[in-house]
């Protein structure tokens, strides 16, 4: 089987935590790699962002990333990339025609890619599987006060994809429910495919490994450490953690607490300086260390150095950071939103917080920070929990889904009107 994956707005080869690169990039590269190992030929189409990239990158046997020139290499924000959909689609068509390449199925990721996938589906007359990763209606329902709302244009495009894709692949039952509730999706066309973690890379370390990680990161060996890993934007909630830390230290100024915030800027709503300034304003800047985004092999040290990983997001379709942390043996305190209650086994591998009140977050963090026995037990259970979520298992689910889609009587290649209805 040969599959065309589309990830227009961000390359799976880009460093997670930088700009628009995050969990989706990890998902695409990880599933592509595992599908390739299972014998599926995968081409991932993405927009070129620098001339030195080269058109084709052979990532592994059966796995290529195709860089399509569409608009300037730099200077376009994600919100402006819809202006380049035609150029990108034209580049995909030109590449496949030049190489005489035919695909059995398209798998698009995010709404921008979905619009291109929808067109390719009708031109190539093959099935379209679409994964949204995030949804405008959901983000607007849960967004932080500081966040910029998602546009109505995006929501309309997502509705078109919900109505026209042959299969909608989602991470959890919660995401399925969101599609039905906000977009009136047909449940029979939705398949739940659980994401995973690189459980060969993210492994628990012993005391010596933890000590080494803390030395590398400049963290006191005997401090209690809470870490945040993710893009620095209000929707991910770093401001919630900073306020919670201020609350904890106001209650007990002598608490031996350190915080690591690992991530880069993303989106128009905030910059790293926003959060550094907030820490200074609240008087906790001496307790917080900001780290640049790190590749996965270096991110392991951040997870191992922490006693707790905090995931205060306003919504997550799954929560890869939570799963990676648990694979390394670090318990998680996460917001009770989206797919996080699936990623975190409440009371067993971590704790869930209702809402984003810093005082409540401080209470929950203190519960684990002050109970070594429970925290250590949760870390041990977290490793076992994470073993149920591997990228190999995700790829196996996707491969089965692809096979079903290519053999079923899907709408692949049947044009629809602009309102989503099929032509008679």
Curated annotation (Swiss-Prot):
User: Subunit info?
Assistant: Homodimer.
Q: Which residues does the annotation say bind UDP-N-acetyl-alpha-D-glucosamine?
A: 15-16, 23, 231, 236, 294, 316, 324
- Recorded catalytic activity of this chain's protein: 1D-myo-inositol 3-phosphate + UDP-N-acetyl-alpha-D-glucosamine = 1D-myo-inositol 2-acetamido-2-deoxy-alpha-D-glucopyranoside 3-phosphate + UDP + H(+)
Supply the InterPro entries for this chain.
Glyco_trans_1, Glyco_trans_4-like_N, Mycothiol_biosynthesis_MshA
Q: Which HAMAP family is this protein grouped with?
A: MshA (MF_01695)
Which is one Pfam family of this protein? Glyco_trans_4_4
Name recorded for this polypeptide: D-inositol 3-phosphate glycosyltransferase
Binding sites annotated in the UniProt record for 1D-myo-inositol 3-phosphate: 9, 20-25, 78, 110, 134, 154
Spell out the family assignment given in the record's similarity comment. Answer: Belongs to the glycosyltransferase group 1 family. MshA subfamily.
Q: Does the keyword Plastid apply?
A: no
Its keywords, alphabetically, are: Glycosyltransferase, Magnesium, Metal-binding, Transferase
Q: What organism does the record attribute this protein to?
A: Corynebacterium efficiens (strain DSM 44549 / YS-314 / AJ 12310 / JCM 11189 / NBRC 100395)
Please state what class of enzyme this protein is: transferase
Q: What Gene Ontology molecular-function terms does this entry list?
A: acetylglucosaminyltransferase activity; D-inositol-3-phosphate glycosyltransferase activity; magnesium ion binding
Known EC number: 2.4.1.250
- General function of this protein: Catalyzes the transfer of a N-acetyl-glucosamine moiety to 1D-myo-inositol 3-phosphate to produce 1D-myo-inositol 2-acetamido-2-deoxy-glucopyranoside 3-phosphate in the mycothiol biosynthesis pathway.
| One GO-annotated biological process of the protein | mycothiol biosynthetic process
- The record lists Mg(2+) as bound by 303-304, 306, 330
